[in-house]
């Protein structure tokens, strides 16, 4: 009978754990941020949880801060710990997750020394980014400019060069003028000036903002779900050489177990079916 009760208790505990997930809290002098970690990136998720449980992130700093781009931290090796973290994590790219504002992603070494785009074992960044117009997200402006330069050579567009010269010091006006000739460039030279982008990305980058050029280059493994304004505050601090804040911005990271349906209901993350 005792064995049966023991087995039932283990089963109940196991079921309860399966119905729960971690909710991350990142404490900073500017306020707290809460984050969720995606199950679709299991290697990065496990690594982040393990380091958090070990207290590795505590007393680390945001060592690289770039306004309208991202805030980077988590380099536990800067603490001078003799047990340096020098391993990498295989990339876990997923089209569902992209670099909209608040995305939690893994930093990494550049392609020339890291062609597989493997992630740092500890460093991460949180996207600040900027809001883009729909034209910026759906039109290859460089391809369009190349097409316009071809038009300069056409007799019927001989006055076009002068029009561009008049607005050359105004980036927005230059772009606006070029857009008027998009259809002509497409048809006349067969240049593809349109870019494909899924509706979810288009809506996110044109409303909340982000850093779309990072998509497919770095693994996004989580998202800030509370304290988005803290990203702006940290991104706005004064920085010195190497984009390092003049005054340290330390952090401590902790986790708590909450029900998965709480995360889905409050933060909109839908867990994958197993």
Describe the residue ranges of each PLM region.
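Cyclophilin-like peptidyl-prolyl cis-trans isomerases
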Residues: 15-274
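Sec-dependent N-terminal signal peptides
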Residues: 3-13
């Amino acid at each position: 009978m005792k064995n049966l009760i023991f087995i039932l208790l283990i089963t109940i505990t196991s079921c309860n754990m399966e119905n729960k997930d971690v909710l991350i809290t990142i404490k900073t002098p500017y306020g707290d941020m809460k984050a969720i970690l995606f199950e679709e990136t299991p290697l990065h998720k496990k690594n982040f949880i393990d380091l958090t449980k070990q207290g590795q992130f505590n007393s680390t700093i945001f060592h690289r801060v770039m306004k309208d781009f991202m805030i980077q931290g988590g380099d536990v090796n800067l603490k001078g710990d003799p047990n340096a973290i020098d391993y990498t994590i295989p990339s876990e790219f997923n089209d569902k997750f992209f670099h909209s504002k608040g995305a939690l992603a893994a930093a990494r070494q550049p392609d020339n020394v890291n062609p597989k785009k493997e992630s740092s074992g500890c460093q991460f960044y949180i996207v600040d980014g900027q809001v883009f117009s729909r034209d910026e997200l759906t039109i290859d402006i460089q391809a369009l400019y190349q097409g316009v330069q071809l038009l300069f050579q056409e007799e019927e567009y001989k006055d076009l060069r002068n029009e561009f010269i008049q607005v050359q010091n105004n980036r927005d006006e230059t772009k606006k003028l070029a857009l008027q000739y998009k259809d002509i460039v497409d048809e006349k030279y067969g240049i593809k000036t349109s870019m494909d982008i899924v509706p979810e990305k288009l809506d996110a980058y044109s409303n909340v903002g982000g850093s779309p050029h990072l998509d497919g280059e770095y693994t996004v493994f989580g998202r800030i779900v509370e304290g988005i304004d803290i990203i702006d505050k940290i991104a706005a601090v004064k920085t010195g050489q190497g984009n390092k804040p003049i005054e340290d911005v330390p952090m401590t990271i902790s986790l708590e177990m909450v029900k998965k349906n709480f995360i889905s209901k409050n933060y909109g993350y839908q867990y994958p079916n197993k």
